[in-house]
Regions:
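Short, conserved beta-turn/loop elements at beta-strand boundaries and strand-helix junctions
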Residues: 64-68, 93
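Short, exposed beta-strand/loop patches in secreted or surface proteins that constitute
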Residues: 37-40, 60-63
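Hydrophobic pocket/interface hotspot
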Residues: 17-21, 27-28, 46, 60, ...
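Short beta-strand segments that buttress and anchor functional surface loops
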Residues: 45-51, 70-77, 102
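Beta-strand/loop substructures that line and gate deep hydrophobic ligand-binding cavities in soluble
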Residues: 74-126, 133
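Hydrophobic/aromatic beta-strand elements that line small-molecule binding cavities or substrate pockets
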Residues: 8, 56-62, 83-90
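Glycine-centered tight beta-turn/hairpin loop motif at sheet-sheet or coil-to-beta transitions
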Residues: 1, 51-53, 79
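Hydrophobic ligand-binding cavity/cleft-lining segments
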Residues: 1-38
Length: 133
């Protein structure tokens, strides 16, 4: 199984970043606009449309406000395994770090997933840099 890790520095307080991450249906407006173009809630899942045209059904596994950690999974024909977590850590009063981890199979999809996560990380940084909470 391939594990992909991103440690993302964000120019915003941890509470503000967590609030955007925990808003499960607003990925396209509050966390990663431009990278994600639409998010539709469907029960405990969200249907995410990415800027490149890809669509994924992400199932909410856990949303732990005390730990500022959200876990989700993708079930699809292309993936035999996908589990992910996003956790926010304070880095002083005005900055935070987002730890985004994805475990995925098959291994062959890992380079694509890594590149997409890098675009997502940049979108998060841009969103908070331009729109201070």
């Amino acid at each position: 199984m391939a594990s992909i890790h991103k440690d993302i520095s964000i120019d915003a307080p941890a509470d503000a970043v967590w609030d955007a991450i925990a808003d499960f249906g607003a990925l396209h407006t509050r966390l990663a606009p431009g990278f994600v173009t639409d998010t539709q809630l469907d029960g405990d899942a969200r249907i995410v449309t990415f800027a490149n045209g890809a669509v994924a059904r992400e199932i909410l596994v856990d949303c732990d406000a005390a730990r500022m950690r959200l876990a989700y999974a993708i079930v699809s024909e292309r993936l035999s395994q996908h589990s992910a977590s996003v956790q926010v850590l304070a880095d002083g009063a005005e900055r935070s770090r987002v730890i985004w981890t994805v475990d995925v199979l098959p291994h062959e999809i890992a380079p694509y997933m890594d590149a997409q996560m890098e675009l997502g990380a940049r979108a998060m940084q841009t969103r908070f840099h331009r729109h201070r909470p």
